[in-house]
Amino acid sequence: MANTAQARKRARQNTKRRQNSASQRSMVRTYLKRVDAAIAAKDYDAATEAYKKAVPVLDRMADKGILHKNKAARRKSRLNKTIKGLLA
């Protein structure tokens, strides 16, 4: 338990930040699920549209520190590679 005023304030801040981060991570997962669903349906056009919507979200979360920048880049790269494979 926090004993000082500073520690109590930090605990409050951490709780609020954790909730915000969880919400934003959930949003990222939702966008990625839409891309994955389009890929599973082998629908190139839908997958491309979903990917174009997911990329800025991934970039924003990487900038905010919700996701590591390398993880965001890796996910974008793998999704793009999979989508390009739908044409082959």
Swiss-Prot record:
One GO cellular component assignment for this chain's record is: small ribosomal subunit
For this UniProt record, the keywords arranged alphabetically read as follows:
Ribonucleoprotein, Ribosomal protein, RNA-binding, rRNA-binding
- InterPro entries the record matches: Ribosomal_bS20, Ribosomal_bS20_sf
Q: Superkingdom of this entry's organism?
A: Bacteria
* UniProt-recorded Gene Ontology molecular function terms: small ribosomal subunit rRNA binding; structural constituent of ribosome
**BP GO terms, sorted:** translation
Region annotated Disordered sits at 1-26
Q: Which portions of the chain have biased composition (kind: Basic residues)?
A: 7-19
Q: Does the entry feature the keyword Magnesium, yes or no? A: no
> What's the short name of a Pfam family annotated to this entry?
Ribosomal_S20p
Query: Which pairs are disulfide-linked?
Result: none
Function (record text): Binds directly to 16S ribosomal RNA.
Which family does the entry's similarity section mention?
Belongs to the bacterial ribosomal protein bS20 family.
What is the name of this protein? Small ribosomal subunit protein bS20
